[in-house]
A protein has these predicted regions:
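Active-site activation/catalytic loop segments of kinase-like enzymes and analogous catalytic loops
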Residues: 241-274, 288-293
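Active-site acidic catalytic loop and adjacent metal/ATP-binding pocket
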Residues: 39-49, 55-56, 90, 195-242
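All-alpha amphipathic helical-bundle segments outside canonical DNA-binding/catalytic cores
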Residues: 132, 275-287
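A conserved alpha-helical element in kinase catalytic cores
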Residues: 58-109, 126, 131-135
């Protein structure tokens, strides 16, 4: 059974009842709930009678409690070190916890949380992505990683396919399944470069808990400033510099000068949370090598 097959299937009426019964959040007559996009979970935007907004998150039936606990802990850690504006905050349930439990019509148990709402438009829908906005993105990720420094949780030290530090295992396992010979040859060539030039130096780089998924639909923007980031489901204890690498990888897409976009993001990150000499040297070496691969 896949994660999608275990996704929750609650109606908007049931979501309103969960918010009320578990968290004491009474949805107003004109406040939704409004379903939000999600493949494996179920999210609803709520508004109460006073206009206050929150997001109800009903987890996949396969989601581990410990991972949600780790996410909530990270959100609270960030708030205590950099203020609550960077990311949503878990709201307290009637029983004093921040994670409740509900049972679906199929009998499966789902963990449920209520998070504060952050206003903003997804970066993907904000144009143009000029140097200032990309540097702002990098700066935001730097502030986030700085706020996450010192946070840890056993559940985040996990085997996870989207962790860049574990990329060699994932690519090595699946590259032979690429049907197109040309694509497979390209991946094998790049993978060979990665194994020889990059992998040996990763272990010595700075490690810590990272967000891990700064894609342009998770990053929110308001008035040309990054207002927050969503979806901490890919959090993992990994290479800290992977966070800015992921943000830069999304930022370069469809850009006429992709390396310029990367430079803008990295510059903003470095100004907010300086990269170490070893991290900069590794990036320079990989970039120089990749241009000749």
């Amino acid at each position: 059974m896949t994660l999608v097959q275990h996704a929750p299937r609650f109606s908007v009426e049931e979501a309103a009842a969960i918010a009320r019964d578990c968290f004491g959040f009474a949805v107003g007559s004109e406040g939704g709930p409004s379903p939000l996009p999600s493949e494996r979970d179920q999210n609803f935007l709520l508004r109460d009678g006073q206009g206050r907004q929150a997001v109800l998150k009903i987890a996949n039936a396969l989601e581990e409690y410990a991972l949600l606990e780790a996410q909530n802990g990270a959100l609270q850690h960030v708030a205590s070190h950099a203020g609550a504006a960077l990311c949503p905050q878990p709201l307290t349930a009637r029983d004093g916890s921040t994670i409740g439990a509900v049972t679906g019509a199929d009998g499966r148990k789902h963990w449920v949380r209520l998070l504060s709402y952050i206003d903003g438009k997804p970066l993907a829908l904000v144009k143009p992505h000029d140097a200032g906005l990309l540097a702002e993105l990098g700066g935001f990720m730097g502030r986030l990683d700085g706020a996450l420094a010192g946070y840890d949780h056993p559940a985040l030290r996990r085997t996870f396919h989207w962790d860049l530090a574990q990329a060699a295992n994932v690519i090595g396992q699946y590259k032979d399944e690429i049907a197109d010979p040309q694509r497979r040859a390209l991946i094998e060539r790049l993978f060979g470069h990665f194994e020889q030039a990059t992998l040996p130096g990763l272990g010595g780089l700075r490690h810590g808990v990272i967000h891990g998924d700064a894609n342009d639909y998770n990053v929110l923007v308001r008035d040309r400033q990054v207002s927050g980031i969503l979806d901490f489901g890919d959090m993992v204890y990994s290479i800290v510099a992977a966070d800015v690498a992921i943000a830069a990888a999304y930022a370069l897409l469809d850009k006429p000068l992709p390396l310029g976009a990367v430079a803008d993001v990295v510059r903003g990150y470095h100004d907010a949370y300086p990269l170490g000499e070893d991290e900069v040297a590794r990036a320079e070496k990989d970039l120089d090598k990749s241009t000749h691969t």
